[in-house]
Amino acid sequence: MAARGGKKEPPDAVHLNRLLYERVRKELRCQRLHTEHSINPLRPVHAVTQKPMSWHDNIEEPADARFLNIIHQAALEPTKKYSEPQTESQEIGWNTTPLTDVDRTDRRLFFPRRRTEITMHSAAGGHPKKQ
């Protein structure tokens, strides 16, 4: 054995073989091969049900038209379901049609996006493009 802080001798082939033999012997001692399997009678068995959303299990079932109509009706937005708003929150934005027609030639009320040097600089992520 080398002294503390000294150089360690590299292991020779006999020493490496002895280490490998010892390792394999310990592994084989701890491993156990099971070839027969059975159900534990003391543990309760749970039944596995089918997946509810699987399409291949529900192919033969006919679709109920009334039920589908109820589902589709419930998924509609409130303006299509009801003639008037049902809550105070629904009153805001119930009428979605604009009160006046938008005149795109009138510059007082129409502000389109413009491309300037500053907007192109910020759209590029703050880095000016080299041209």
Curated annotation (Swiss-Prot):
Spans annotated as Disordered: 79-99
InterPro entries linked: CFAP144 (IPR029214)
Q: Name one GO molecular function term.
A: microtubule binding
Q: Where in the cell is it found?
A: Cytoplasm, Cytoskeleton, Cilium axoneme; Cytoplasm, Cytoskeleton, Flagellum axoneme
Q: What is its main location?
A: cytoplasm
- Gene Ontology CC: one annotated term: ciliary base
Per UniProt, the ranges with Polar residues bias are 84-99
Q: Kindly state which keywords UniProt assigns to this record, in alphabetical order.
A: Cell projection, Cilium, Cytoplasm, Cytoskeleton, Flagellum
Which organs or tissues contain this protein?
A: Expressed in choroid plexus (at protein level). Expressed by motile ciliated cells in choroid plexus.
Q: Where do transmembrane segments lie in this chain?
A: none
Family membership noted in the UniProt record: Belongs to the CFAP144 family.
Q: What exactly does this protein do?
A: Microtubule inner protein (MIP) part of the dynein-decorated doublet microtubules (DMTs) in cilia axoneme, which is required for motile cilia beating.
Which PANTHER family does this entry report, sorted A to Z? PROTEIN FAM183B
State the name under which the record lists this protein: Cilia- and flagella-associated protein 144
